[in-house]
Amino acid sequence: MAVNQNHTVDRRWAAIPHGESLLKKCSEVDLSFPQSPPGSNLFSGTKRGALFLTSYRVIFVTSRADNDPMFSFTMPFHLMNNCTVEQPIFGANYIKGTIQAAPDGGWEGSATFKIVFRKGGAIDFAQLMAKAASAAAQGVPLRVASFWMGPLGIYVITGDRNMYAPQAYQVAYGAPPAGYGASPVGYGVPSAGYGAPPAGYGAPPVGYVAPSPGYDVLPPGYGAVRYGSPPPLYVATPMGYGVPPPGYGPPPVRYGSPPPGYEAPTMEYGAQPPRYGTTPMGSGSPPPRYEAPPMGYGTPPSGRESIPPGSRATSVAQEAPPAGSEAGHPMSVAVQNPEFQASFPSTSSSQVHSPRSKM
């Protein structure tokens, strides 16, 4: 334990030793010594101030309002014994224990201390102090933030965050005490890892530009080719297909020009094929099995508009009946030799004469 060695000149803050982290601070704390070494007035009375917990020790800083010869009181963990948390029925909770004097600490012997937490927090402080003491004994101290004294006051350097987050601390300003003038080596300017951003976080690589505000202007390649005329992959619409109705875009790639096997509609869907002659008025197109009459036949007489079903066209060798003769009876042969022409009956006769045989 040391007396008057870890406080600022104005007694607003504790002077944290180099390499230690501030874990917790409690204000409105009373410190008293029920049992103190004889012959010393430093331990008399009750002192009011603030209590600081670091990685290796507990520091009490007396309030400026108290006219007390003890400005600060430091208790390292390895010199504290028999620490307990007391919870009286009437009064605030407090921590009680025994402290041994440190070499060159400003006093000798041992004393019993009592720390009363007027605004609460004794149990939390005692639990955190026990964890910090155990971690320090194992060589892995708790670290949250490191403090060092500079020309303008106390500065905070962020350290390893093992368990507890730092609280909002007040910065004390004033001239540093003797021995704490210049900042220690390693706690001045933050290390290179906390300075300027690394090279990978500098300017964006070549080819990356800032996006246009609101995407008003389309990027290259998305101009009229996409929203205007069809892209090069789409060919013109085949003949016979009009403009698509609104809402239909250009046809897909696979529906471009028709394949070679699908030509334009043949002429059989338009005008009649060349092999069909002109049919008389009032009659439709002849069935597909009827072909054009031979060369010797003219226009059928009146009343015979079309060739009856089932009949076939006569050969070219057969000739038309002589002039003046009527069309043959439906059951008679279509054409006879001229010498047998006289034997044909008239159309009004019901008798049929058979031709004479020629011997």
From Swiss-Prot:
Chain spans, region 6 X 7 AA tandem repeat of Y-G-X-P-P-X-G: 173-303
Motif PPxY motif 2, residue numbers: 231-234
Organism of this sequence: Mus musculus (Mouse)
Its biological purpose: May play a role in meiotic resumption and pronuclear formation, mediated by a WW domain-signaling pathway during fertilization.
UniProt KW keywords: Repeat
Motif PPxY motif 1 positions after renumbering to this chain: 219-222
Gene Ontology CC annotations of this record: perinuclear theca; sperm flagellum; sperm head
Tissue specificity statement from the Swiss-Prot or TrEMBL entry: Expressed in testis.
Motif (PPxY motif 4): 259-262
UniProt motif PPxY motif 5: location: 273-276
Xref: Pfam families: GRAM
Biased composition, class Polar residues, residue ranges: 334-359
Protein name per the record: Postacrosomal sheath WW domain-binding protein
